[in-house]
Amino acid sequence: MPRGQASKRRAREKRRQARGEDQCLGGAQATAAEKEKLPSSSSPACQSPPQSFPNAGIPQESQRASYPSSPASAVSLTSSDEGAKGQKGESPNSFHGPSSSESTGRDLLNTKTGELVQFLLNKYIRKEPITREAMLKVINRKYKQHFPEILRRSTENVEVVFGLYLKEMDPSRQSYVLVGKLDFPNQGSLSDGGGFPLSGLLMVLLSTIFMHGNRATEEEMWECLNALGMYKGRKHFIYGEPQELVTKDLVREGYLEYQQVPSSDPPRYEFLWGPRARAETSKMKVLEFVAKLNDTVASTYKSRYEEALREEEEQARARAVARDSARARASRSFQP
């Protein structure tokens, strides 16, 4: 490409990125927003759904995709669930009327978190090491004092949603690498085919189903997927076509059930836990996952917590009956 054309292309890209950051900052001027003080680690994550990458290939560094600053935005809690309130009657991730500067600072923190998440995933796809120096360069050195909080949010995102965690490889060089974190005991085939474990995404989907009363409508599931940057008919650069994934692949694996709502006319569809999900995880584990996303404890969600406890008690009784039955059979087999 001639030098002049390349220069113009870079200029257009910079203008496009500036417009995107302006939108993320709620219409404020990017130059003014950059001067705002970033919020403390106690600030809640924004809940606005992100945009997916422009194409299905490996995203380029210049493609500023927006990731949710916390996967909590993907788990849509039912408003009728009285347990979704904190001890003071508030949602665990609610907050009281932030000032304009606080809101702008929080949006900027979310933007920087999204940029770092994109960078980490690029490195994982390319199987390249990650250095602290490179991460600082991505977020801009002027935010060095906020790097620990941005890194914490970013690593939480990739751990929960993508099933990856950041492992230190060389302390002297401050070099790291993303590695898979397997949460399901029998998930050898639970992968997107490109090396990304699906356990994190699956936990988000199972959480959505459980928090909606053990069955989630197709609309509720797509609201969840949209919050993760996954849209119907649009190929995701990691997971491929989302509809194929949730209605066929995960159903075939036994993790989800996809069925028509009884007596619905016109037909409507819903998602339930599949037999493999029921065998490999539990309502309590999923509820603890939801609580972790919202920086609270499982008992905060009273009705769901009681339901999860009942399931644990029933499973404990079933195991006790099975053990007693096995002992009785063994005893009879040794009788003359």
Swiss-Prot record:
Q: Where is the MAGE domain?
A: 109-336
Q: Region labeled Disordered — which residues?
A: 1-108
Low complexity composition bias: which ranges? 39-54, 62-80
For this protein, the record's PROSITE patterns field holds: MAGE
Gene3D superfamilies per record: MAGE homology domain, winged helix WH1 motif (1.10.10.1200), MAGE homology domain, winged helix WH2 motif (1.10.10.1210)
- Biological processes annotated in GO: negative regulation of transcription by RNA polymerase II
Its Gene Ontology cellular component terms are: nucleus
Skewed-composition ranges (Basic residues): 1-17
Biased amino acid composition, Polar residues: 90-103
Which InterPro entries does this entry report, sorted A to Z?
MAGE (IPR037445), MAGE_N (IPR021072), MAGE_WH1 (IPR041898), MAGE_WH2 (IPR041899), MHD_dom (IPR002190)
Q: Which residues form a coiled coil?
A: none
Pfam families named among the record's database cross-references: MAGE (PF01454), MAGE_N (PF12440)
UniProt-recorded name of the protein: Melanoma-associated antigen B17
> Top-down, what is the taxonomic lineage of the species of origin?
Eukaryota, Metazoa, Chordata, Craniata, Vertebrata
Name of encoding gene: MAGEB17
